[in-house]
Amino acid sequence: MKLAVLYAGQGAQHPGMGKEFYEGSPAFRAAFDSAELDFDLHRVCFEDPDGLLNQTEYTQPCMVAFACGVTAVLAQQGVKPAYVAGLSLGEYSALEAAGVFTAKQAIELAAYSGKAMAEAAKGIDCGMTAVLNLDRQALAACCEQAAQLGCVQICNYNCPGQLVIGGEKAAVDKAAALAKEAGARRCIPLKVSGPFHTRLMAPAGDALAKRFASESFGEMQVPVLFNCLGREKADADSIPALLVKQVQSSVYMEDTLRRLGELGVDHILEVGPGSALAGFVKKTLPGVVCASVETPEQLNAALTAWKEEL
């Protein structure tokens, strides 16, 4: 058995995520509570009475805190992945799992990233749209044609048949209309608070570069596959530059999954919340066994099913 652990990105968050783990696992609590933030992490993540969880400056640290907690539980259970990766924001969680960041560092960096991205998005009439069943080249041509109206790029290569475009709303809407004419089955506008993974996020990249200059990183203990490359990179010194590039560049998740297949991965554990990545795995690597983990019950079920192979 060769296991990879994948970490979810923004969009899967919901109030209450991680609460069962927090109440039942000291290891989860220690990781979750390790960061110093300027808001009440428990209140936003577990209850969210003020509706803050879907704002990126809150979403990001909440998601990473949840993921770091689950990683601590996995380590306690003796789970040792051969590879780790994350979708977008999930890359911070993957780097924590690999030993590059501490849990405290990953959560605090995610909080900083969220604020930087929210600031970069201010004043931009932005949009992101999922495009189904149109190939990369055809969609790229649609974006190129629509770019006369503003910035529009393919920002996520999720899996076969699912791409996401983003940028300035007028250009995104035009590219989506052209995509339908070119044969796309559906174009689904997404609820987002910024034009993520486009060049409009360059100011966020600049802010992150300054922050990373003051950070120290641990040695990579597990190979990480990076969003902007779609493959692993062993050179830990390049991590800051890759994260700066990631925030303003396309996420190659389909390429990442195909690379995991090439590396012999036959089991994948998705650390949620949600199961979006499991859907991508099913479409990209149909022969790979995949389980999604959001609750202790789901984790125990996966580990029990895989016990003999682990």
Feature roles, as predicted:
Residues 225, 244, 257-261, 278, ...:
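Generic hydrophobic alpha-helical scaffold/packing signal
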Residues 11-12, 37-42, 98-249:
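Alpha/beta catalytic cores of group-transfer enzymes, especially the acyltransferase/condensing modules
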Residues 252-253:
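Amphipathic coiled-coil/heptad-repeat helices and related helical stalk/stem segments
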